[in-house]
Amino acid sequence: MAEENIIFVGKKPTMNYVLAVVTQFNNNANKIIIKARGKTISKAVDVAEITRHKFIPDAKYEEIKLDTETLQGERGSSNVSSIEITLSR
């Protein structure tokens, strides 16, 4: 899969990411991966749901992956949850 078909969800407003997903589908992408970590996981789910229900009704969930990543910080290591949602049409 091309690197440009991956959307990393962060601190921006939810609709910015929805627009990015819709734009990728309109540019003939067959699959989009929405990735998020930690507190932004719920926003990634919102992005996928808004995209499916309001903009691209024929989009389907192809795969959902959950994982835990270990990050090294100043105070040692911490575990952070992550999600990858694959939408296709």
Swiss-Prot record:
GO molecular-function terms, A-Z: double-stranded DNA binding; RNA binding
Keyword Membrane: no
PTM comment: Acetylated. Acetylation at Lys-11 decreases DNA-binding affinity.
GO CC terms of this entry: chromosome; cytoplasm
Keywords for this protein: Acetylation, Chromosome, Cytoplasm, DNA condensation, DNA-binding
Pfam families in the record: Alba
Entry similarity comment: Belongs to the histone-like Alba family.
Function: Binds double-stranded DNA tightly but without sequence specificity. Involved in DNA compaction.
HAMAP family according to UniProt: AlbA
Gene transcribed to yield this protein: albA
Protein name in UniProt: DNA/RNA-binding protein Alba
GO BP annotations listed: chromosome condensation
NCBIfam families in UniProt: DNA-binding protein Alba, PRK04015.1
N6-acetyllysine modification, residue list: K11
Keyword Transmembrane helix among UniProt keywords: no
Highest taxon above the source species: Archaea
Signal peptide: none
Cellular localization per UniProt: Cytoplasm; Chromosome
